[in-house]
Amino acid sequence: MSEIVVPRQFRGPPFTANGGYICGVLANAVGGRGVAMLRSGVPLDVAVTLQPGEEGAILLTNAESAVLGSARPADDSQIPSPPPAPPSVEEARAFAAASQFAQRSLHRGCFSCC
């Protein structure tokens, strides 16, 4: 078991940690390729606990032992091989221009929601 505290700089939606950041923490705790799932918002600047689950899984729990997220080792069938090709710069710009969120952020101050 180990405690982590997500610093405010990794904020996602108001008062919670960025989901991508937390999924990365969970997958890293599995010790290799993993499949992560969030179940609830992870608070900022509050200790939460990473603890072992069944069959190599990792659980992220709060002080009340509620499971906030989990990760488990991924088998090869869950990982595309080869991975999908990234979009071209032109494709990414076209998508951004067409997005309803291109000019505004849903969550101001979010680590990656810009």
Region locations from a protein language model:
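General N-terminal targeting signals
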Residues: 21-23, 51-53, 75-77
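Active-site helix/loop of acyl-thioester processing domains in fatty-acid/polyketide metabolism
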Residues: 2, 9, 13-35
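Surface-exposed beta-strand edges and their flanking turn/coil or helix-capping segments
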Residues: 17-20, 49-51, 82-85
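Generic hydrophobic segment detector
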Residues: 30-41, 109-114
